[in-house]
Each structure stands twice: as C-alpha cells, then as structure tokens.
Amino acid sequence: MNLLHLDSSILGDHSASRQLTHEVVQAYQRSHADSQVTYRDLASEALGHFSAASLAAAGTPVEARDASQQQEVDTNEATLQQFLAAEVLVIGAPMYNFTIPSQLKAWFDRIMVAGRTFRYSEAGPEGLCGGKKVIIVSTSGGLHVGQPTGAGHEELLKALFAFIGITDLQFVRAHGLAYGEEPRANAMTAAQQHIESELFAA
C-alpha cells in the first residue's frame, strides 16, 4: 500500500498535529508491514498560492512556455501524480483562524483538476478518486466541531474530498489545546489512545 503523509503545521517540533500524524503513520506501518510511505512537508516546502500565472502556465503550449511556466507545470503535475499514486493519505490539518492552513489549501488547488480527479457531466460533477482512504489529524486551540466556527475546517475537508470521490475519511482529533496544560495533555492522550486502540483495529 502506498501511503502519502502530509504535514501542514507551521509550528515545527512544537506542532501537535505533526506529532500525531507521525504516530498514525507508525501505527499504520505496524499493521501494514508492506506499506510504502512518501512524506511531504507543505509548510517547509510550500507550494505557491494558485494564481493567474498558474493558469497561464497550464494553458500555454509546451513549446511556448518560459522556464518559470514549465517549472510551475512540472511542480503541479508531480504533486498530482504523488496524490494519485497514494492509496492511503495521512494529513495533518491544524485549524488556523477557523480554517485549514493556506499551505494545505494550495495543495488541494493542485490536486483538484478537472478531467483528472473530477469531471463534469450532464448530471453534475463526478469524483474520479474513489477507493482512497484518508486519515485526518485535526487539531485546534478551541472546540469548534459542530459549531459555525468549525465549518471551514473539518466540514471543508469533507467537502473537498467528497467532490473528488473520496468519502472514506477518519478523523483523529486533539481539540481545546489552548485551554491550559491539563486540557491539552488530556486531548493529546485521548488522540494517542484512539490511534493505538481503535484506528486500525480489525
């Protein structure tokens, strides 16, 4: 099984989501000894924001592209191919200002490609990436699940993946991390217990 591990937190070694995605991947490897893991750090190796230049590069014939346009096309295609090759994705998705990190959104902008990961028909949009499994490590300083303030975080992630045909999503949550040392420790412990005892249980 090919597993794609994505981190998007800007907090480096201080990141709760990075710690937990690492533990998820370790747990997955223990139960899937033949798994092949590809790691990508979307914060330290950030993709540029999707822009008019991105669209222009894609729409320019190969022979007419300048070096920067070709680099943009190559980066976008490599990102898409990396996603398409993955059967399982483990994604660290902290909440920043009620939504996902902009670095993670830039990644979505590279994989949501008409004709490749979804298509339009007379019946409407159709996702083309069914069969993949996604495990999302969701972290936040407050408690937002089920609240209007959470709509741009987990609900957004569900909508983005559903649009391209992926509905097998599992969440590992560590929320309320800014509420003090004890609530943070309790949230992290609960997430770790979920990873160890439930996430990959037969």
From Swiss-Prot:
Q: What is its EC number?
A: 1.6.5.-, 1.7.1.17
Q: Which Gene3D superfamilies match?
A: 3.40.50.360
Instruction: Report the cofactors.
Output: FMN
Q: Give UniProt keywords alphabetically.
A: Flavoprotein, FMN, NAD, Oxidoreductase
Could you give the cofactor binding note from the entry? Binds 1 FMN per subunit.
The reaction(s) annotated as catalysed by this protein in its Swiss-Prot or TrEMBL entry are: 2 a quinone + NADH + H(+) = 2 a 1,4-benzosemiquinone + NAD(+); N,N-dimethyl-1,4-phenylenediamine + anthranilate + 2 NAD(+) = 2-(4-dimethylaminophenyl)diazenylbenzoate + 2 NADH + 2 H(+)
The residues listed in the UniProt record as binding FMN, with positions renumbered to this chain, are 9, 15-17, 95-98, 139-142
Annotated GO molecular function terms are:
electron transfer activity; FMN binding; oxidoreductase activity, acting on NAD(P)H as acceptor; oxidoreductase activity, acting on NAD(P)H, quinone or similar compound as acceptor
Quaternary structure?
Homodimer.
Family named by the database record: Belongs to the azoreductase type 1 family.
What does this protein's UniProt record list under function?
Answer: Quinone reductase that provides resistance to thiol-specific stress caused by electrophilic quinones. Also exhibits azoreductase activity. Catalyzes the reductive cleavage of the azo bond in aromatic azo compounds to the corresponding amines.
Its protein name is FMN-dependent NADH:quinone oxidoreductase
Q: Which organism is it from?
A: Pseudomonas savastanoi pv. phaseolicola (strain 1448A / Race 6)
